[in-house]
Amino acid sequence: MTVIDTDKQFPPPLPEGGLRIIPLGGLGAIGRNMTVFEYAGKLLVVDCGVLFPDVEQPGVDLILPDFGPILDRLNDVQAIVLTHGHEDHIGAVPYLLAHKPDIPLVGSQFTLALVEAKLAERRIEPYALTVREGGRERLGPFECEFFAVNHSIPDALAVAIRTPAGLVLHTGDFKMDQLPLDGRITDLAGFARLGGEGVDLLLSDSTNAEIPGFVTPEREIGPVLDSIFAKATGRIIVASFASHVHRVQQVLDSAGEHGRKVAFIGRSMVRNMGIARDLGLLRIPPGLVIALDEATTLPPERIVLMSTGSQGEPMSALGRMASGDHRHITIAPGDTVVLASSLVPGNETAVYRVINRLSRGGATVIHKDVAKVHVSGHAPAGELLYLLNVTRPSNLMPVHGEWRHLRAHARLGVESGVAPDRVVICEDGDVVDLVEGRASVVGRLGSRYVYVDGLAVGDVGESLLTERRILGDGGFISATVVVDSVTGKVVGGPTVSAKGFSDDPDAFNPVIPLITEALGRAALDGIADPHQLQQIVRRTVGRWVNDAYRRRPMIVPTVVEV
């Protein structure tokens, strides 16, 4: 098994006739999925998604893949192939097209509709090529064939990429639900045909590689929702991903059966369900869905609110309801709230905070830990083994997962018969070459997190995030002192103030004489340089704070010369 080498060098030139694969996101964390394929000087991008920040990235809105390795080669990009419409696969498209808006987008009808809605907000009109399962498109030197896969969003596709270097299958996100609500199963027959042809490299979804067995059918959620609706005596609020059309369909069906009207809440929910309805992916009986304004006039027992916010996002519709900040909806006793989604890693604290706030407001909260209101959209180990046995790849590159998922998937590959030295575990920015049927890591281009903070893209770095974490954890202390520019002696102050540290206005009285004493010693030693004096103030305050409070705030010393 090829493992991570921390001393990787810059990659050599791609050998003639070889295929280069560069993952720019999606490895080591679930999100920012983006993979670049290179053949004969041309590039093909598969997916271009975002990662959502966690508590270690305060103030950050989104995290993008690092486009740096391809920014000076955008003219070589033949297309961006999008496997499906989840944000971790399409969310970064507007940021990449901001550099070159005419890069063709290739995807299914629903996927492209979601992307085009995002691009319209930025006044970008893309060149879009709609494909279907069973279709083939030649994109420069890349011959792409598309296969239906079942996932937690309609119209998901896998893509087989053929070049003279070999056949590569990229599954995208998938599972093997044998009874999907839309009747669209993962194309195992097509994958078996590829296996007969000879899959030289398989890139496959690793999210649930640690989980044994097979996925629970989506159909099992319907009866659970029916039971919840039958028992609820007041208003029902269901929170789900804004792209989970199948779950919304189940909610609509249950609402109709129990004589309730449905209102969509949240901008992305309203937009996406409108797109799904227009494309015939969402069946809405006449009169079932109403506007939120009308819903607020009906008795609670006659309405269902279909909302965003299943991941505890504070500014989502459900998040604002939980905190009492929603303009139209106030949580009240008798409400039943259903969180019909999985927990995305890193969101646990936020989700349980929302659950507790809803419970405090009097709502009964039902989530996946207490009822089967959600099933995963990703293949567990049994289905991954099935895929491996059907496709029989010569080389395996696990993608889409944290390190534990990638390694679990790698073990499955070896168990299924892939040679250990043909299983390639990579990290973002690695360079993998497929040459003469063998895939191997040949170097590293590097890849960093690109943070979106408001309108700023890439301006926030790790050092700034460290400062924000220090501010959040320890607060801020400012120490100002005036010194003689010649002797360095204190002639004014010190004054010490703080934010987020203590409410006691006299808390810093003990440190003031310590600063004066330290600067006095410095003056006797002939130290008058303001920068050196600032460091003395910083160290003095820091030692005192550590001794007195065992805290590490941000300390900003200011030395003024007169």
Positions of predicted regions on the chain:
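Broad gene-expression machinery/nucleic-acid interaction feature
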Residues: 141, 156-158, 302, 474-478, ...
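Conserved hydrophobic residues forming the short capping helix/wall of the S-adenosyl-L-methionine
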Residues: 119, 413, 545
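A glycine- and charged-residue-rich anion-binding loop/surface
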Residues: 4, 27, 51-55, 76-77, ...
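Short Gly/Ser/Thr- and Asp/Glu-enriched loop/turn motifs at secondary-structure junctions
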Residues: 132, 427, 551-555
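His/Asp/Glu-rich metal-coordinating catalytic cores
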Residues: 2-81, 86-298, 316-330, 349-353
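Hard-cation-handling environments
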Residues: 210-346, 350-506, 510, 514-526, ...
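Structured loops at beta-to-helix junctions and adjacent beta-edge loops in soluble globular domains
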Residues: 24, 40, 162, 205-207, ...
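C-terminal tails and terminal domains of large nucleic-acid-associated
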Residues: 526-562
